[in-house]
């Protein structure tokens, strides 16, 4: 593509994935100083002082601020589709808190994921997830904010209720019947974990997608970094590299997601593995993005 990728997408990264060992303020400062990034995804802050420092940096940066509530659920093992109503309410409460924190930091919405499920109670879990998501969307709507559900694997690692893509489409359609501030977040690194292609996922979920992530996964059992670990592009025995990202970009172009007037956020969901250097891994991702974009036909 002769046009810059920044014309059609707000390129972001997930702060806590890119810099898992950094002090969060140092990390935000470093990313805010990098003009490759148009967006940043942040999560829950440990205290008011740190949150205030982050807000000050973000306000100066001209970065689009996005808020990922996934760690709020994964860390304490809260489940928004918990069939136990008390458990479900706890998950809902932290997502409501996330809306408030996101608003304070300048984000226009939050993203989260579904929880674990059992085959025998899948329909009940689905109903519970609808209840949670509707309540959170109703609260967010009062603030003019959106709520995005990230599609995950259903049997490999996170084993979340939502995907695969057709099931995510059903859920999104049900949500849109009542809440127009709901959308889906899709992640290239999750496609191999749901045994799906970029074309299938994007075409299946097209009306509901509001946000993109890119990354990699190892789906060969017994291999290092197996599951939903988000290793760098080109990691040994992994599923995604330049060609797969090029295919992803091609599908987004064909399906009408190149939007210069109101660009979608497209964020790196890539994490250093073991003792890998975070800055080299970020540079690796940028190189792969630049190469795949350069190969994309106008």
Question: How would you label these PLM feature ranges?
Answer:
Residues 1-99, 103, 141, 179-181, ...:
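N-terminal pre-domain/capping segments
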Residues 17-23, 39-54, 118-120, 155-162, ...:
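Acidic-and-aromatic substrate-binding clefts and catalytic sites of carbohydrate-active enzymes
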